[in-house]
Every structure is written in structure tokens, then in C-alpha cells.
């Protein structure tokens, strides 16, 4: 195990046994990580809305002659909202997949679809049905996860983003999908719990 600790923080890394790795891959931990990312995504969305309203108010003041100063436009964080939303849904879907296919974590490694960022494929494998709007969100978010949510260019000029515009409605669609899939998580968890043999049974 290696350890690094200073004023920046603490980081410890080391090799895990395959058994302990499998324990850490339990679906409940995927749900927990999804919750962290869900909250962070919504915080970014809220900041975007506040920035937008502040800019509108500043422009209105300029038009009405209340100020002569040109308003500054803060750096947008909306694409990062989509990025974190994608990672949140990815964790939820992968956790549900593992309820059905725990063998996808074996020998201290993940395999197959567990290494994918394709939200449509993950949702299908997890048994999650999507509305047309949720389907569209997953397509958009999947592309953000591997490209425009993180980098200014793609890996190839042949597949490059020409324009993107994210609406406030996407935040609601994401949040409602997250809440719905979280309920599926609870159902799967209780189903699994009922299947665990009780002592003396």
C-alpha cells in the first residue's frame, strides 16, 4: 500500500483481494456513488440558473440606463451538469445490472458492459424502460461522458460537436429518472434480502 498525506489531502492506494473488491462492487455502493453525483449535478444546474438570471438582470439594467457597465458572463457549467448526470445514471444502471449479473465482477476485475459508458445499453441491460425524453437525455449524456462534457475536441475530426444547447427541462427529466430508478434499486434490494437464508432456517 502507498500513502500520501499533506495539506492537500490524503490518498492511500493498494492492492485489494478479489474477495474484498467484489464486496466493494456491491450494488448498494453503486447507488451511493450515484447519489453523490446526482447531488453534485443538481448543484451545478442550480448555479447555471442563478448565473443566467443574474445576467438577465444585469442586461435589463443596462438597457434601462441604470448602469453603463457591460455585465460579465460567468463560465457556463451546464455541460458539466450533463457530465455528472451521465455518471450518476451510469452508476445506477450498473448497480442494477450487478443485481442481475454479479458475475460481471469476478477475479478482482469488472468485465463486459460494466466498462461501458453507453447509457442506453446499460439501461436496457438493467431492465430500465425509458420514456422518449429520458431516451434523448441518455443519448445526450452518453456523448457528454466521453467527449464534450470533458474535452474541447473529440478523438477525431469526423465526429465533432457542431452545437449543443441544454434546456432547463433536462434537469427535471434527469431528476425524475434518477428518483424512479432509485425506487427500482430499493425493490431489488428488498428482493435480494428476502432471498438470503436466515440462521436456523
Positions of PLM-derived features:
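Long, charged low-complexity segments
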Residues: 1-42, 101-201
Amino acid at each position: 500500500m502507498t500513502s500520501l498525506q499533506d495539506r492537500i489531502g490524503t490518498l492511500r492506494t493498494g492492492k485489494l483481494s478479489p474477495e474484498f473488491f467484489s464486496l466493494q462492487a456491491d450494488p448498494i455502493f453503486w447507488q451511493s456513488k450515484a447519489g453523490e453525483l446526482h447531488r453534485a449535478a443538481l448543484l451545478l444546474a442550480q448555479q447555471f440558473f442563478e448565473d443566467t438570471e443574474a445576467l438577465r438582470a444585469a442586461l435589463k439594467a443596462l438597457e434601462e440606463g441604470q448602469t453603463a457597465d457591460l455585465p460579465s458572463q460567468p463560465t457556463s457549467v451546464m455541460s458539466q451538469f450533463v457530465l455528472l448526470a451521465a455518471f450518476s445514471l451510469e452508476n445506477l444502471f450498473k448497480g442494477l445490472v450487478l443485481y442481475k449479473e454479479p458475475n460481471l465482477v469476478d477475479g478482482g476485475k469488472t468485465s463486459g458492459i460494466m466498462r461501458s459508458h453507453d447509457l442506453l445499453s446499460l439501461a436496457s441491460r438493467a431492465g430500465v424502460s425509458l420514456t422518449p425524453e429520458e431516451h434523448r437525455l441518455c443519448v445526450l449524456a452518453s456523448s457528454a461522458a466521453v467527449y464534450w462534457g470533458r474535452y474541447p475536441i473529440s478523438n477525431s475530426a469526423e465526429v465533432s460537436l457542431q452545437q449543443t444547447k441544454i434546456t432547463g427541462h433536462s434537469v427535471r427529466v434527469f431528476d425524475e429518472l434518477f428518483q424512479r430508478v432509485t425506487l427500482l434499486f430499493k425493490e431489488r434490494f428488498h428482493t435480494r434480502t428476502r432471498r438470503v437464508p436466515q440462521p436456523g432456517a
